[in-house]
């Protein structure tokens, strides 16, 4: 796994298709463990189902890579993801930590991002409450 393959994996402009199951199986180990702030999935079938589920819940999705760092079998990819849902666009900046096995496939994939702020911030009434909570506990 090199930076060119990682950049391709983390690139999906609005209006273009997501990676196919075949493409994901070429990059991910059968026993891949995936975790993000909303879910944990074990195995390639569960990972593919999670990706398909996200695509079905959204009108469109984009993914844009930023900085990519690889050290031996660990890679970090900064990214920005946009989700369009019912006419509202949600933007999530984040980073992925990928562990690569000896066959060059991802065996562990963990995404780090703030789910609450970008999800509920744009929503009337809830957005104000979320911003109040952040100020109360973060500032």
Q: Where would I find each of the regions flagged by the language model?
A:
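A solvent-exposed, acidic/Ser-Thr-rich amphipathic alpha-helical stretch
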Residues: 21-25, 29-73
């Amino acid at each position: 796994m090199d930076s060119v393959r990682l950049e391709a994996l983390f690139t999906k402009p609005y209006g273009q298709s997501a990676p196919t199951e075949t493409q994901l199986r070429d990059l991910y180990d059968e026993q891949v463990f995936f975790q993000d702030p909303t879910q944990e999935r074990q195995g390639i079938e569960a990972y593919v189902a999670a990706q398909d589920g996200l695509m079905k819940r959204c009108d469109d999705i984009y993914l844009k890579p930023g900085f990519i760092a690889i050290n031996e079998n660990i890679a970090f990819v900064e990214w920005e993801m946009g989700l369009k849902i019912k006419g509202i666009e949600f933007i999530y900046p984040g980073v992925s930590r990928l562990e690569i096995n000896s066959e060059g496939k991802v065996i562990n994939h963990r995404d780090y991002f703030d789910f609450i702020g970008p999800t509920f911030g744009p929503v009337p009434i809830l957005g104000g409450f979320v911003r109040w909570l952040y100020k109360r506990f973060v500032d």
